[in-house]
Amino acid sequence: GERDSVIRVNMTDTLFRMQLPFVPSRVLPNTDGRGYGVFVPDEPALHWLAAHWWEIEDDTARQSLLMGLYENYLAKHISADDWVNSLITGLPAEKNALVASTASGYLANVMREIAPANRAEVEARIYTMTQNHPLPSCRIQLMRLFMQNAISEPMVKKLYILWQQQSDKHLNRQDYTTLAYELAIRMPLESEQILRTQRARIDDPDRLRQFDFISRAAVSDTARLDTLFNSLLAAENRRIEPWTTAVIRYLNHPLREDQSVKYIRPGLEVLEEVQCTGDIFFPKNWAAALLGNHLSSSAYEEVV
């Protein structure tokens, strides 16, 4: 029968050759996580890992190999759809909170790369995990991921009912406010009503000020959105930097990618002024909010 063998090597170059006293069925690199760099298994081992990582009993090895799979996805050795399928197949069985959190984070990073034909099924499987995953912390993380990424009509409807009833007790008040922003963007005909209802739920004066500042970016009127963006080019209108970053992010929401390309160049042109007038981290946050949701060639042309 098969058994696992751990062989430690001292790699000083990109290639290491050694003789084995047996014929391995697969070679899984860096199972203890001590190696640094991208470890690329051969194709059979990579496919096996993608289909079986959750079956590995040792928590450290499972975490390390999951990280290795992610690195191979980034290196284009695994397709986005295969990677998503691997994550949503293995994640329901994951009982280690750290490994589950890592897998959920990887899932968030790849959602926009999924083929449109597979999107609805993936969203439905994620929603199922938000309801029945054995780890409460994972259910919360997945629900927050789901809130930010669901676009299929049945799943948006589920989110709307959740927001109306505030039925998930694991979510906090800020989660429901964030959900209101997301729903307002997804449901433009109901955006004013959603934002008005959410505002009425807020009784803390500071949170109300924050809501009034950020919610302007969730309305459906493009002229108002353009005016809002242009106002943020003036330093006096972006004094509260975390709120400003949130506004820029919603203005450049993935569902608004086509209409928000026009914000990129003026947003970058003011970056030096943002650096001079803001906190040391604000320029990075500004640029990330401005560019992070853009994947189009037209957006690329704005920055080259």
Functional labels for PLM-detected ranges:
Residues 14-16:
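Short strand-edge motifs at loop-to-beta-strand transitions and within beta-strands
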Residues 6-10:
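Solvent-exposed serine/threonine-rich low-complexity stretches and specific carbohydrate-binding patches
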Residues 3-4, 19-304:
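Long, ordered, helix-rich scaffold segments
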